[in-house]
Amino acid sequence: MPKAKAKTKNTEIISPHHYVYPNTTTLKNKYGIKNLNAFLEKCSHDTAKAMINLREESLPEYFDTAYLCHIHQQLFKNTFEWAGYLRHIPFTFADGTTAAMPEMKRTGWKNAFAIGDEIQEGLQRLDQTLAEKNNLQGLTREEFNSEAIELFNSLNQLHPFREGNGRTQRLFFENLAKAAGHQLNFSLITKERMMVASVAVAENGDLEPMQHLFEDISNPEKIRLLKEFMHTMKNTGRNVNDRPVMVAKEGETYTGTYRGAGLEGFALNVKGAYIIGNIDHLPPEQLKILKPGDKITFTAPKAEELKKTLIPKETLVPLTKLEIAEMVAEDAFVHTCRDQICSLSKIVYGSQGVLNKNIIEIIKNPSKGQQLATQIERTPYSVHSLAGFDLICFKTGARVRAEKHVALLSCAVANFTHAVKHARQEITKEHQAEQNRLRQEVPMPSQSLQDLLSLPKEFQQKALGVSPLLQKELTSLLQKVNSRLSSSEQRALRENNHETLAKNLGVSEQKAKEITKTVMKAREVQQKSQTRTVSHSKTLAMAS
């Protein structure tokens, strides 16, 4: 590890403020640049070049503090005088000032980084651990990640350098992984994701985000998915560094906006985060029609259909048996009936959960409900032993109470069965109604009607008045629009909320603007026509 330069004056004040130019927030640098943005740009350029050179270096024999400082020194040797020096050790600049920062805390964080000698002690533990565990070599990828995450979080907390900790630390662990026969590709991690994962550990002790991060940058398949997405973003000139970007976790369900697909993966925008999934996990027929801007549950029309239609149709797939069962289970009345069964089961059988499996079966197959109700009524003990005891001439109070409630339990099961059947019917009916609504296509108005809508307002009613066909087409158009749009889509249209309308319909925002403009103009023309008709009728009535 490099040693700090000797102080030129014994009376020199040691201060963390000496790291920056007076009256600025810009770190003293070899370029002599005091403008912060200009400095950051120059520093970023130089460290990017240095990073390339460092990746071409041979891997070290030992991964320790000395190598960590070497990386920092090589990254920032053209930028800082103190490149490679630890922040808690006083460093004297060429201008004679001496700086040290034994205490350091990121703005907005509750906890500070390691203080003073804690830095050296922590680095010694890092060296010892890596030496004892042979630089984490000979481990599976999962085992390596588990060990590396612990060290990574520890080094995060030490924050040994005044600046450049992240870049130094990431390259250190990339090479540590490489030497162990694994890979950690930190270039695929956005600044925001790294910050979120680091804060979760430092502030809340939550390891999950960091574990997810290491899984994504070490698993070859997930690395391919992230590389493809990042490459696409770069080619389109989009900077996603301020967004969390992560591969979908196994077992997790994501609901969001579909952003597009590449050869390997597809992207969902979930509350501002990009979730990358494997396209093999999507049905082919769904993948072929999905377009950026759609909700993942929506089916987008083909581009050529948009040219012929004002509002495209959607194909809503039938509900699966499992989906119906899940929706039935969430029905309020079904819930009430189920609660009643549980209460009576406690009395009759001594446990609320005795019939849980039967309840699930009834939800899946209602025909089994009446069978169970009859079985409970006739031979309740064949389902489960009754509560209490029956000792020849003596029955406990619990047994007497259980027998008295058998009929009620049988009735409750029958009621539950009826509730399930009714819920299934309603769910199916509502879904079919939604299918019917979505499959309606609203054609583009004829050129004649488009021309009429484009006329100055004072000429529209005159043109409409001499053309019964245009009147009929206008009425038909608005009837189809009202039938096609949901209440939320109608509201978005009225409020000129093009983004919401576009997302709901699975169209571009430009198409949503066209729909809004056409429909609102058509409604205005029809409203004026109706007002004019009513006014004319009143005039005739008064004249007669």
UniProtKB/Swiss-Prot annotation:
Any one GO CC term of this protein is: extracellular region
Chemical reaction(s) catalysed = L-tyrosyl-[protein] + ATP = O-(5'-adenylyl)-L-tyrosyl-[protein] + diphosphate; L-threonyl-[protein] + ATP = 3-O-(5'-adenylyl)-L-threonyl-[protein] + diphosphate
Q: Which Pfam families match?
A: Fic, ID
Q: List the keywords (alphabetical).
A: ATP-binding, Nucleotide-binding, Nucleotidyltransferase, Secreted, Transferase, Virulence
GO biological process assignments: protein adenylylation; regulation of cell division; symbiont-mediated suppression of host apoptosis
Q: Which residues form the Fido domain?
A: 63-216
Record's keyword annotation contains Transmembrane: no
Under PROSITE patterns, the record lists: FIDO (PS51459)
For this UniProt entry, the molecular function terms from Gene Ontology, in alphabetical order, are: AMPylase activity; ATP binding
Positions that bind ATP: F93, A94, R106, T107, E163, G164, N165, G166, R167, R170
Localization of this protein: Secreted
* UniProt keyword annotation of Nucleus present: no
The EC number on file is: 2.7.7.108
Checking NCBIfam families in the record gives:
T4SS_effec_BID (NF033856)
Q: What does this protein do?
A: Adenylyltransferase involved in virulence by mediating the addition of adenosine 5'-monophosphate (AMP) to specific residue of host target proteins.
Question: What is recorded about the protein's domains?
Answer: The fido domain mediates the adenylyltransferase activity.
Task: Please state what the protein is called.
Answer: Protein adenylyltransferase
Source species of the chain: Bartonella henselae (strain ATCC 49882 / DSM 28221 / CCUG 30454 / Houston 1)
